[in-house]
Amino acid sequence: MKYKKEREEMILQYSSSGIYDYEYFRDIPDEKNATPGKAMYLYMFRKNSANINSSLSQIFSATILNLALKGVLTFEMVNDKEVRIYISSGSAEKLNTLERDEKLVYELISKAIWGKGYTTTKEFSRFASREYDLVYSKLNRIDNTVEDILEETGKISRDKKAVAKKWSKKQIGYFTGAFMIFMFMPYIPAITIGLVLLGISARKNAVCFSILTDEGEDEAAQWKGLKKYMEDYSLLNEKQVPDIVLWEKYLVYATAFGISDKVIRQLKMVHPEMFEARDDYNRYTYWNMVSSPRFNSNMFNDFSRDLGRVYDRARNAYSAAHSSSSSGSGGGGGFSGGSSGGGGGGGGSCGGR
């Protein structure tokens, strides 16, 4: 028992160090296994959690771009307003290489495309409005799916997670006990105050340390460094003409982070030659959407935003349907709609990380 307590105290102490930091990071972290969902989870991670549901529109859009880079989907630019999305021929063999969060998105696209052979963002939005339960519930599994993957791959510590859960349960117990005593035995306030103080202490222990392993902390810092690199690109005075294949990958994560507009503007300022007409668009996955003079200059951003609205449509329809049913039964408020970005992890009471 004594050993177990000492081990928990060691985990709490060790987990508050926050030893990793990168001003800029130029590679895709853990590129072979990276997905927009995992990137956003680690980027948004605060203390002991990361609620990415508030960013599902961006994650959904970025995942579709990434599936195209992996050869699972194909885009066809019909005109300035319409992009068709196809399942690529031979994609069945590639499905086993996808991460589970990517498969959730792929399954939705397969259903939206079924029977016609392709879909567009408008058709996909109509599908999401009809099948809102399916779309909303499947995409809201991304958060837990990503967390499970990160735990399985050693980036979230099972030990730290268990300690955090234990302190969360204690916190609930202390506050519940304080409330019950206040209600039924108000003449002994000392016990109520003591339980409240214990609850506050338990909450601090639950939220004020990171459940990430060293590897997870390092990768989280790398994602922050990559985002900053993309945001500050025009300030870095990099002379070499960028590799378009690499920047297509960057744009996946710029889309997930919600900064693709800014990144493209900076590229145009520093390397306008990347946006001139070229004969080799077929070498790339979607660079013609970014730079081809045949299409409007905002086509890529319009396309990625329209993809994000697919999830928004499903969420709004789900909210309306479930709010009306819960209000009819007097339950109210059955839908949380997605939390504030990044799960603040206990706010200012934790101090710096």
Label every PLM stretch briefly.
Residues 10-30, 133-141, 145-166, 200-353:
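Short hydrophobic helical membrane-anchoring segments positioned at the boundary
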Residues 4, 15, 21-25, 44, ...:
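Compositionally biased, intrinsically disordered low-complexity regions enriched in proline and serine
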Residues 1-170, 206-246:
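Short, amphipathic alpha-helical interface elements at domain boundaries
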Residues 93-101, 181-182, 276, 283-287:
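Short, structured secondary-structure boundary patches
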Residues 1, 163-212, 301:
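Alpha-helical transmembrane spans
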Residues 32, 189-192, 275:
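A generic alpha-helix propensity feature with a strong bias for hydrophobic helices
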